[in-house]
């Protein structure tokens, strides 16, 4: 008979290891039971099935770890194989719901987050498309102990940032991209899943602590895949990531691009000179975006050049969207929302002064949740409706097509713009365009307005 939540640490390890190479169906066959007899077919994912049939844990929302008194939480989580052969987490690891009304009263080591998640028994399974969940196999297990993790200090910093925002009455402004590894992801069916917060009358979206998808991807590659060639930014230091960045700014702020190139021994005609400069600032040989910390936190480094008149050359765009895919999504789970809510940018700011670009500092930025849930949502929904209704082309004047896609003048944050090499670089449409009858149309993508980007750097103008 299964002990359920009463297994001790050694027993949990033995059972976890025994599950490797098995699917849920394999486990069910060993138990001589069928899913139909034990579980409603409409309830639970693979994780709940493993909890129930491997350990005998019934589905619950208990505030305690799954195994008491061992103090171990059980998490069953998927990873996938990318086209290039690399491994990636399929999703974030959702932990416990954030109790806005009480969590702020605690210190990190006495918090409900720590109590619930300081020791997690991870069971990884390989997700494969077009395969029934019950046939997916558990491939690896790992007892993840936060107290022993090299990321503990950063995770504590992330927790403190989330709590600071709650204490400031800004729980409604929380975004998963605010932090590095430990995020605050939305937890609810839709935007109407609102909760009271203690220091503001504005209700906030229900959120849960989570390990970000980018962080889980690095754990997958570390414990399952090949992680031998990943370079670290934080080498031989006890500093947090933010402390390290401040040291970089203090060291190089005020130096011209030419002075930095001379200091790092770089030629002015070298390709990707800006990428090489920012890598040297961080004392790494590889691309900064490919280092461990940047991949874990999903940080995109980008050089920003401000002209003497305040003009900013750089723009921010996203990969082209497939018309046939965008109409299959809804706003709450669309690719653009996911990207903006989980991505942080690290801007290296250079300003033109007396004919030379001078390094002014580093700005970590992610799009505020209020902008995502208003302007971006409006733009995305109009794009969705335009494609689905077949009303892409508005008019044709002198052979030039004008579309119904959102332009820069219509939205204060973002717009839609062509992304193809030329008019012949197209994607299939889900329904023919009504005006032209076309079944394909030029590739388009989402862009962040240059005027919006300029506001991000007002302190440097």
Which residues does each predicted region cover?
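Nucleic-acid endonuclease domains
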Residues: 1-461
């Amino acid at each position: 008979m299964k002990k359920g939540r009463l297994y001790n640490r050694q027993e949990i390890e033995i059972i976890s290891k025994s599950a490797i190479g098995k699917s849920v169906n394999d486990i069910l066959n060993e138990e001589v039971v069928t899913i139909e007899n034990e579980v409603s077919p409409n309830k639970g994912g693979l994780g709940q099935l493993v909890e129930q049939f491997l350990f005998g844990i019934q589905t619950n929302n208990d505030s305690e770890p799954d195994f008491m008194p061992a103090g171990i939480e059980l998490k069953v989580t998927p990873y996938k194989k990318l086209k290039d052969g690399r491994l990636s987490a399929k999703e974030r690891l959702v932990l416990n719901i954030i109790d806005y009304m009480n969590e702020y009263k605690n210190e990190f080591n006495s918090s409900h987050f720590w109590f619930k998640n300081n020791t997690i028994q991870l069971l990884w399974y390989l997700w494969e498309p077009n395969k029934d969940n019950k046939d997916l196999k558990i491939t690896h297990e790992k007892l993840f102990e936060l107290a022993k993790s090299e990321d503990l200090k950063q995770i504590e910093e992330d927790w403190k940032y989330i709590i600071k925002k709650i204490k400031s009455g800004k729980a409604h402004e929380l975004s998963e991209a605010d932090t590095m590894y430990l995020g605050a992801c939305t937890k609810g069916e839709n935007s109407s899943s609102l909760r009271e917060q203690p220091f503001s009358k504005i209700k906030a979206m229900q959120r849960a602590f989570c390990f970000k998808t980018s962080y889980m991807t690095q754990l997958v590659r570390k414990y399952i895949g090949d992680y031998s060639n990943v370079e670290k930014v934080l080498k031989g230091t006890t500093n947090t990531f933010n402390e390290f960045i401040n040291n970089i700014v203090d060291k190089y702020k005020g130096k011209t691009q030419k002075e930095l190139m001379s200091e790092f021994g770089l030629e002015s005609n070298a390709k990707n000179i800006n990428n090489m400069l920012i890598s040297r600032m961080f004392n790494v040989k590889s691309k900064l975006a490919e280092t461990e910390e940047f991949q874990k936190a999903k940080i995109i480094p980008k050089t920003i050049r401000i002209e003497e008149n305040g003009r900013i050359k750089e723009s921010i765009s996203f990969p082209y969207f497939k018309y046939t895919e965008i109409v299959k999504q809804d706003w709450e789970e669309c690719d653009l929302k996911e990207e903006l809510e989980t991505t942080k940018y690290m801007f290296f700011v250079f300003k033109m002064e007396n004919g030379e670009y001078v390094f002014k500092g580093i700005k970590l930025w992610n799009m505020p949740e209020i902008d995502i849930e208003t302007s971006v949502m409006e733009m995305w929904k109009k794009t969705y409706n335009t494609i689905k209704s077949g009303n892409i082309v508005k008019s044709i004047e002198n052979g030039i097509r004008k579309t119904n896609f959102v332009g820069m003048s219509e939205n204060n944050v973002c717009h839609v713009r062509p992304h193809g090499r030329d008019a012949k670089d197209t994607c299939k449409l889900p329904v023919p365009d009504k005006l032209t009858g076309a079944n394909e149309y030029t590739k388009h993508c989402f862009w962040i307005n240059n005027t919006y980007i300029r506001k991000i750097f007002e302190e440097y103008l």
